[in-house]
C-alpha cells in the first residue's frame, strides 16, 4: 500500500479539509475519475479501487493514480483512558477536495473505462464522476 518512505514529523495535527483542489484536469491518460465530493481516502481504499480497475480492464491499457496518502492518522488503543499523549499512527490518508482527478486511464475503449471506473467508485467513500480529456 501507498505511504511515504520518510517524513519530517511522525504525527500531524488533524487540520481541516477546505479549499479548492489542484490537479483538476486529465493530464496523463484519456479518461479520468474525478471527485465530486470532499473527504479523505485511505491507502487501503486507493489500492482496492486500483485492483478493481486493473481486473476490469484485464491488465490492458495503463492506469495512473493521481492521489497519494501523505497524512498519518493516529488512534489510541481500545479501553485506554484519555490523555497520556497522542496515539500511534494507524493508517495514511489523502485529503480530497471537489474537482480532484483521482485516477486516469488510457489504451482502452470508453465503454471499458466507464465500467472500470464504476467498479472503482464503488470502493471509494466519496462521490465521483467520469471525465474525458479536453483537447485544446
From Swiss-Prot:
InterPro entries per the UniProt record, alphabetical: Ribosomal_uL16, Ribosomal_uL16_bact-type, Ribosomal_uL16_CS, Ribosomal_uL16_dom, Ribosomal_uL16_sf
Membrane-crossing residue ranges in chain numbering: none
Keywords (A to Z) from UniProt: Ribonucleoprotein, Ribosomal protein, RNA-binding, rRNA-binding, tRNA-binding
GO BP field: translation
CC terms in the record's Gene Ontology section: cytosolic large ribosomal subunit
Cross-referenced HAMAP family: Ribosomal_uL16
Subunit note: Part of the 50S ribosomal subunit.
UniProt record similarity statement: Belongs to the universal ribosomal protein uL16 family.
Purpose of the protein: Binds 23S rRNA and is also seen to make contacts with the A and possibly P site tRNAs.
Protein name: Large ribosomal subunit protein uL16
Gene: rplP
Amino acid at each position: 500500500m501507498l505511504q511515504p518512505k520518510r517524513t519530517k514529523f511522525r504525527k500531524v495535527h488533524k487540520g481541516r479539509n477546505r479549499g479548492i483542489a489542484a490537479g483538476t484536469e486529465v493530464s496523463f491518460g484519456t479518461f479520468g475519475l474525478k471527485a465530486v465530493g470532499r473527504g479523505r481516502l485511505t491507502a487501503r481504499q486507493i489500492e482496492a479501487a486500483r485492483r478493481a480497475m486493473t481486473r476490469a480492464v484485464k491488465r490492458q491499457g495503463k492506469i495512473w493514480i493521481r492521489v497519494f496518502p501523505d497524512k498519518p492518522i493516529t488512534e489510541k488503543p481500545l479501553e485506554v483512558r484519555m490523555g497520556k499523549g497522542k496515539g500511534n499512527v494507524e493508517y495514511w490518508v489523502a485529503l480530497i477536495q471537489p474537482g480532484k482527478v483521482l485516477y486516469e486511464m488510457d489504451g482502452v475503449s470508453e465503454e471499458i473505462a466507464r465500467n472500470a471506473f464504476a467498479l472503482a467508485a464503488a470502493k471509494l467513500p466519496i462521490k465521483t464522476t467520469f471525465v474525458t480529456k479536453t483537447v485544446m
